[in-house]
């Protein structure tokens, strides 16, 4: 893989990108200090496929793929269209998703559970209805396990496939299987931010 980290244009672009994604001028938002809390490796740990894949730059491209796949579900699309700040504050929305993904991937269990409570509280208000292709009206709620599973599977598939398609290799042959089987019980799963 080509290393562009020392290319003269890379540093300012990287700095700006960190600011955009994190929501902080220095690329280190206040919430990042939560990552120092807790005394365990969270749900996954440093040897997991989650740490390997989510710690890779391919996650940025995978995130775009995930958003497109998530939007293919009419309930997810309606929820975002009616309740998200993606139009009025797209960078803030991106920073919120970055916070959620970082904490749930790399944080200690108590930090993940705190983030889950925050996001689940926010998403408890995300309810509404949408019209399906057949003209039928359907209700949705962001905390519905079916929709949560759709969103989480879209993230998993998008991050994993992008990682593989960009030519990254797992340190062991069994990691892709572990990524697919790594899960958080739905009762404790934080909604996607």
Where are these regions (language model features)?
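Mature, function-bearing regions of proteins
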Residues: 1-178, 182, 193
